[in-house]
Amino acid sequence: MIKRTSRAFEISSCYDGAMCGRFTNQYTWRELADLYRITEPYIHPISNLEPRFNFAPMQGGVVVRLGKEGRREPVMMRWGLVPSWSKDDKAGAAMINAKAETVAEKPAYRAAFKARPCLVVADGFYEWAKVGPKEKQPYFLTTKGRAPFAFAGLWDWWRAQEAPNDEPRLETFTILTTEPNALCAPIHNRMPVILGRDDWSGWLGTVDERKSLLRSFPAERMECWPVGKAVGNVRNEEAPLIERVAI
């Protein structure tokens, strides 16, 4: 059993009003490079990518954005957006999600929505359903047949005001959420904005294209099942976390 030591917050369930703060990425580097059409993939600094089964806020995740030449580039960023104008980097803990309904107007997100979209690489996520006054049951949600998808994301960069210009900047991302579809609604009142492969270019395109993609993913193209409560501990990082359990 492999456990990952993390400085992420100990989140035992999920954030109120947001999607639950956990997702998975089982893609190997070769699969990711082929799927996202990454150029020169085998000399990339994150080509040693390993499968992850319990991404949590404030941890590093892989996103794909457009580089200076308009080519897709994968980048490791911290989950939890820190706007470039923020006084410190603590804001990220409360900004793992951005509501699709207000993302174009909110000061923390509107600049990123206009100019810094990204695809958050994932192949599944966890949500917690209330089953009693104090008890929640985790579920794993994914696309049927493991059809490729990405979360709609935004990214930004931050550097302390007193830091020298040559100090590396902190790059962070957030995941957009929207109203739940029929599959997700009994489990949670929000769901991530999920982009099928045909929508990736649009999300990385114009603002109008992004606005047209702020919708719930079709329930009939998804599936879910209950999983064990070990996923509630961010240090647990083993493959059996996504296995179905009886309830």
Locate predicted features:
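Short linear sequence motif anchored by a di-proline
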Residues: I2-I247
